[in-house]
A protein has these predicted regions:
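Non-catalytic beta-strand/loop surface segments
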Residues: 6-17, 84-87, 91-93, 286-294
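Flexible loop/turn segments at secondary-structure boundaries
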Residues: 1, 108-109, 137-139, 172-178, ...
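Flexible, glycine/charged-enriched surface loops at secondary-structure junctions
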Residues: 38-53, 95-97, 164-168, 222-229, ...
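Mobile "lid/hinge" segments at catalytic clefts and subdomain interfaces of large enzymes
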Residues: 1-58, 200, 218-223, 228
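A carboxyl-terminal module marker
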Residues: 89-92, 239-243, 248-249, 254, ...
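A generic structural motif
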Residues: 18-26, 71, 105-109, 197-201, ...
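Residues forming anionic-ligand binding surfaces in small-molecule and nucleic-acid pockets
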Residues: 1-18, 56, 61-64, 124-138, ...
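Extended, well-folded interaction surfaces typified by the phenylalanyl-tRNA synthetase beta subunit core
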Residues: 63-225, 360, 413-415, 425-448
Length: 448
């Protein structure tokens, strides 16, 4: 009633009377009064008993109040005794010890402590309440740690030349077939939307890269020679179906590219990201063959502190065909929850080296299935105390290289914090490195 009266701008006695609601318990009193008048005027015969269709009778209810809160809320200093008198004036029963009032059924508008405060102000007098300026303690607005890391990730990826994308969280069930996801995969157990716009938006996504691949396909079909996109968005993994609780929402960084960028460009971005987040020394890249939408021989898992936080590599040719992308494309997917958990933003400063480094380059023949990680691990294991860095600078297969083999070249840097190193200081370490490579990987040192 009050809302309607306000909308039409019409204030009447009826609106004032009925806007607070009517007490259904007054019906019996009205009937009794009518019967009394019938009997008084001898207009009929009164019979005993009442027929009442009233299954859910409204009973008085109780509200607790806090005098200190009411005074703070109103900006007053009214005593508890005065509050009690005001409550009694409006026919509320008061328990002053426990600060509880019993609300009669004819006051349905009193539902909360703020309503009681309004009644106090009405009887106390609005003109007695002194005007005061709002006061409070300002707080410094800032991002949470997770928000800061996410913002840093976005800035870093943008600085590496990728453009941020925003894709739909709703997808079609046909996406799973396009991505070659097996029929028994848990990724197919998606949340179904009860009122979808259509089949193409009928489930919540359980994988993050369909939107990126679709966007890459759009760019390719519009004859863009190259494209690099990324998105930080959530995937929705139900804990059980049908839903009994909220799903696990996993924020995920997805990067995709094609054209004048390849696997090594993508790996470079991931490595830069690991460096910025303080994880470069604990990040490893291990061959990954269990992802059906990725090329089995050109995909690597990103391992940090012994735990996989994502993967990167080339998209499976069959998937590219399903999306209408006629060239090689590359994806990197990182679990942002794990990235945030492993990020280390503590900066450690150290003095610039006082003594020059000593560098040795080695080139070796190894079988083509030997990974550079295996080679790097052996170099680090046998490099000794002076080893500073082992950097891959060349991988070659082709003319003058036997079939089934590849040439791998490393630049190995040694440095001491106490002196200038001589050849004799690193001779033992180099011998151990070469011996380890030969014995464990069958590596053959190349002279030229």
């Amino acid at each position: 009633v009050r809302i309607t009266a306000k909308k039409v701008g019409l204030r009447t006695d009826a609106s004032s009377k009925f806007e607070k609601g009517l007490d259904p318990n007054l019906a019996l009193e009205a009937v009794n009064r009518a019967v009394q008048l019938v009997e008084l005027l001898e207009a009929g015969e009164v019979v005993p008993g009442v027929v009442d269709e009233y299954p859910n009778k409204r009973e008085p209810w109780q509200l607790s109040y806090n005098p200190a809160w009411i005074n703070k809320f109103l900006g007053t200093s009214i005593s508890e005794e005065e509050m009690q008198k005001i409550f009694e004036k409006i026919e509320l029963k008061v328990d002053p010890v426990n600060h509880i009032v019993t609300i009669p059924t004819f006051r349905p508008d009193l539902e909360a402590q703020a309503d009681l405060a309004e009644e106090i102000a009405r009887f106390y007098g609005y003109n007695k309440i002194e005007a005061t300026l709002a006061s409070g303690t300002p707080t410094v607005g800032k991002r949470t740690y997770a928000q800061s890391i996410t913002a840093l990730v976005k800035d870093t990826v943008i600085a590496n030349g990728l453009c941020e994308a925003m894709t739909y969280s709703f997808e079609s069930p046909k996406v799973f077939d396009k991505l070659l996801i097996p029929a028994d995969s848990d990724l197919r157990k998606a949340i179904v939307i009860s009122n979808p716009l259509g089949e193409d938006f009928s489930i919540m996504r359980t994988v993050s890269f369909n939107g990126i691949l679709t966007s890459l396909a759009t760019n390719y079909n519009r004859r863009n020679e190259s494209a690099g996109l990324f998105e930080v968005a959530k995937v929705y993994i139900p804990k059980a179906l049908p839903l009994t609780e909220l799903p696990h929402e996993i924020p995920t960084l997805t990067m995709g590219m094609y054209g004048n960028m390849d696997f090594y460009d993508l790996k470079g971005i991931v490595e830069h990201l690991m460096h910025v987040l303080g994880m470069s020394k604990v990040a490893e890249y291990v061959t990954e063959k269990a992802l059906p939408w990725m090329h089995p021989g050109r995909t690597a898992s990103v391992i940090v502190n012994g735990e996989s936080i994502g993967y990167l590599g080339e998209v499976h040719p069959a998937v590219l065909k399903n999306y209408g992308i006629g060239t090689r494309a590359y994806l990197a997917v990182l679990d942002m929850e794990k990235v945030i958990a492993n990020a280390n933003r503590d900066v450690v400063y150290q003095a610039l080296p006082k003594f020059p480094a000593l560098t040795r380059d080695i080139a070796m023949l190894v079988k083509e299935d030997v990974t550079v990680k295996e080679i790097a691990d052996i170099i680090k294991k046998n490099g000794g105390a002076y080893l500073e860095e082992a950097k891959l600078f060349d991988v070659y297969q082709g003319a003058q290289i036997e079939a089934g083999y590849k040439s791998v070249a490393y630049s190995i840097t040694f440095r001491s914090a106490e002196k200038t190193l001589a050849d004799a200081d690193i001779a033992d370490a180099m011998d151990k490195i070469l011996k380890g490579l030969a014995e464990e990987l069958g590596a053959q040192l190349r002279d030229k």
